[in-house]
Every structure is written in structure tokens, then in C-alpha cells.
Amino acid sequence: MTLTNYVQEVSLADFGKPFHHKAYWNKRLKTTGGRFFPKDGHLDFNPRMLEENGELIFRKIVRHELCHYHLYFEGRGYHHKDRDFKDLLAQVNGLRYVPTSSKSKTNHHYSCQTCGQVYQRKRRINLAKYVCGNCHGKLIEKNQS
């Protein structure tokens, strides 16, 4: 079953309305579950949401995007702030927010030699340039083993 067919099935089952456009996987999405494009009506979905959270949560993400889709084409408020959107989302039991990823986002761990303060960073820092914010001691990178 293709993604577009799956979205069509969810649309008919949960909304009772057909989905007439295309749905695509978008690997570039990092923090969002999906996107609706009013200009041409297509939907993008994050494939990691299905892999990490399973089919049940992904179906709720599809419902969320279909709320945007159906409200837009009905000429009603389709933004997150609109009452029509909030009511329809609650009615179909869709997700308002995407669950956070279980993967650790910190790649580099540093600690102060003097006071032991621990720092976690996504990006490397120049140890010759930066010092501890508490005691101005020298920082060392901890091994990731």
C-alpha cells in the first residue's frame, strides 16, 4: 500500500471524505510529523515518525494533517489557532503535538577538571578557547564508550 493510498483510507474511515491529492515521504523533516501545502494540496510526512512511534501514532499524525486539508478545502479555519481546527482535531482524535524523539540529541560531552560541571552539546567546542562557566577551569571531552 502506498502512502497516498493509506492517507485516502484514513480520510474515508475517519473523516468520511475523500483525499484527492498526493502524499509524499519527506526525509528532510526533522521535528515535525507532517506538512500540508495549500498551494497544491499535497501532504508531506516524516518517515521517522512511523519508524520510531509506530502505526498508531502515525495514524494520528495523518489525521492532524487531514484536518488542515479538509478544513482548507471547505473554506474554514485550518490554522492551529482556529477553533474549527481544534474542534475537528479533537473529534477525530488526532495529535496536536508530535512525540519527542527517544534518541539522545547530545553528541559531545564535556566536564570541568576543577569542579566537575558536566556540559552536553550537539556541536564540538574549541577546548583551547572555552572554559567552565562556574569556575573558569579547563574543560575536557569525555569519552563516548
Curated annotation (Swiss-Prot):
GO molecular function, one term: zinc ion binding
Record InterPro entries: SprT-like_domain, Uncharacterised_SprT-like
Active site residues of this protein: E65
Database matches in Pfam families: SprT-like
Major localization listed first in the record, in broad terms: cytoplasm
Cell compartments where the protein resides: Cytoplasm
Keyword Metal-binding: yes
Record text on cofactor binding: Binds 1 zinc ion.
Alphabetically ordered keywords of this record: Cytoplasm, Metal-binding, Zinc
Cellular component annotations (GO), alphabetically ordered: cytoplasm
Binding site for Zn(2+): H64, H68
Domain SprT-like: 4-140
CC cofactor: Zn(2+)
Annotated GO biological process: response to stress
Database matches in NCBIfam families: PRK04351.1 (NF003339)
Similarity field: Belongs to the SprT family.
Protein name: Protein SprT-like
Source organism of the structure: Streptococcus pyogenes serotype M6 (strain ATCC BAA-946 / MGAS10394)
